[in-house]
């Protein structure tokens, strides 16, 4: 059993390293356009798209129509009504997403492995307000639910929350709510950021990705979604990078993180119905 756990741990670390490289690569492709202006855009890069809750979701040519539509449905599942929703905050979130032309990209798994991969640029006015890709997997058993939920939440927190609530979601402000909550988890040994050490030479990129991943793990735990996304390791509610994975543990051990969730996430998003998500992917 120790050998099995060691193998799973090694595989988790290996897959995490690959994921970090992909994230950094995609972010670095976007940053020059933010600083110097957009390259010539073409609808050929993203020949199809859908709109879901004021978010435009662009797809590369290879993406299946059914998968693109299901990604949109998964996002809409996060916006069901419940008694915790603050209508003013949700309205601000949605209007920011629309007015700032936030978008999500969808591609096919393996595309970014090509050394000549071009992340593409959607038609104007969509430009810059984006984070990473959602990849359509070859098999539903290959972590597809986790892939979709993770990268939608990256867009929610790292792009829309950052734009709509800059004081609390500014990842470059060490005193912002997101930064303080993340460091609470790091200081308590709950969030291990050592796998991101290679990014430290670029402070903006390091802050962007570490807070993005923290917010994702936090929400995943608050939603009790570690199981459905296949992100928990044997003998743990969480995993090697984020060791707790239930709302009760977040409440008990990460008061700043739990408050951040209560103040923003819970007031804007609903927990997606698990049966619905499973039916989509």
Located regions from the model:
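Short, Lys/Arg-enriched N-terminal segments with co-localized hydrophobic residues
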Residues: 1-14
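Pan-zinc metallopeptidase signature
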Residues: 218-281
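Bacterial N-terminal signal peptides that target proteins for export
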Residues: 16-25
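Hydrophobic alpha-helical targeting segments used for export or membrane insertion
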Residues: 26-30
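Conserved aromatic-histidine-acidic binding/catalytic patches
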Residues: 59-63, 140-144, 200-212, 231, ...
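Post-HExxH zinc-binding segment in Zn-dependent metallohydrolases
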Residues: 160-231, 237-239
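Acidic/His-rich structured neighborhood in mature extracellular/periplasmic domains
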Residues: 45, 52-189
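Bacterial Sec-dependent N-terminal signal peptides
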Residues: 31-47
């Amino acid at each position: 059993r120790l050998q099995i756990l060691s193998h799973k741990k090694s595989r988790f670390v290996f897959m995490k390293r690959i994921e970090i490289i992909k994230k950094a690569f995609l972010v670095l492709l976007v940053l020059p356009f933010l600083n110097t202006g957009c390259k010539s855009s073409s609808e050929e890069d993203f020949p199809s798209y859908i709109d879901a809750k004021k978010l435009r979701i662009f797809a590369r040519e290879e993406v299946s129509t059914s998968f693109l539509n299901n990604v949109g449905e998964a996002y809409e599942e996060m916006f069901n009504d419940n008694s915790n929703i603050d209508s003013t905050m949700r309205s601000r979130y949605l209007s920011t997403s629309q007015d700032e032309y936030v978008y999500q990209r969808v591609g096919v798994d393996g595309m970014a492995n090509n050394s000549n991969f071009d992340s593409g640029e959607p038609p104007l006015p969509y430009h810059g307000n984006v984070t990473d890709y959602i990849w359509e997997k070859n098999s539903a058993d290959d972590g597809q639910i986790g892939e979709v939920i993770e990268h939608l939440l990256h867009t929610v927190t790292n792009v829309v929350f950052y734009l709509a609530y800059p004081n609390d979601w500014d990842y470059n402000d060490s005193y912002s709510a997101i930064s303080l909550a993340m460091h609470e988890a790091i200081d308590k040994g709950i969030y291990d950021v050592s796998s991101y050490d290679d990014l430290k030479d670029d402070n903006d990129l390091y802050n962007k990705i570490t807070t993005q991943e923290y917010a994702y793990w936090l929400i995943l735990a608050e939603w009790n979604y570690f199981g459905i996304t296949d992100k928990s390791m044997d003998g743990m509610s969480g995993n090697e990078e984020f060791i707790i994975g239930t709302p009760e543990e977040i409440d008990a051990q990460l008061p700043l993180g739990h408050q951040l969730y209560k103040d923003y996430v819970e007031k804007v998003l609903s927990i997606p119905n698990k049966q619905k998500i499973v039916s989509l992917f």
